[in-house]
């Protein structure tokens, strides 16, 4: 079987929340994509509930694109501790961490309401009933209070 990078990561050594550059790949035509581990909670110590995670996913899909060009995808980990963020081009962990922090600040604000969450209607989402804006806001506040590091092993909070 092929080795999967994320299964090679020692999940007992990382210190969440953090943004970690997983790697960059160059396609056959020279296009570069960059993959990031955006870890919001400590692996095997906590997990974001599915409804909150789902609302964070939908909200961040728009909030991140408002702040940086070239985002391909922001997809949750099955373990519910964070997200893969895939970008066109080369980007640093610090650049992405700043975008994530700013996006979470907006999501956690009092002004951010259901009207700001995209894709929460039946025709737009495959599990539209499974959302929690309250949960998304509470997790965002917790993540921001802990600080987002640019290093997975040493706290270098932006």
Curated annotation (Swiss-Prot):
Keyword Nuclease listed: no
GO molecular function: iron ion binding; S-ribosylhomocysteine lyase activity
Name under which the protein is recorded: S-ribosylhomocysteine lyase
Main function: Involved in the synthesis of autoinducer 2 (AI-2) which is secreted by bacteria and is used to communicate both the cell density and the metabolic potential of the environment. The regulation of gene expression in response to changes in cell density is called quorum sensing. Catalyzes the transformation of S-ribosylhomocysteine (RHC) to homocysteine (HC) and 4,5-dihydroxy-2,3-pentadione (DPD).
Subunit structure: Homodimer.
Cofactor(s) for this UniProt protein: Fe cation
Catalytic class of the enzyme: lyase
EC number per UniProt: 4.4.1.21
Family, per entry: Belongs to the LuxS family.
Gene name as annotated: luxS
Alphabetical keyword list: Autoinducer synthesis, Iron, Lyase, Metal-binding, Quorum sensing
Catalytic reaction list: S-(5-deoxy-D-ribos-5-yl)-L-homocysteine = (S)-4,5-dihydroxypentane-2,3-dione + L-homocysteine
UniProt cross-references to InterPro entries, sorted A to Z: LuxS_sf, Metalloenz_LuxS/M16, S-ribosylhomocysteinase
Cofactor: how bound: Binds 1 Fe cation per subunit.
Residues that coordinate or bind Fe cation: 54, 58, 125
Keyword Metal-binding (UniProt): yes
Record GO biological process: quorum sensing
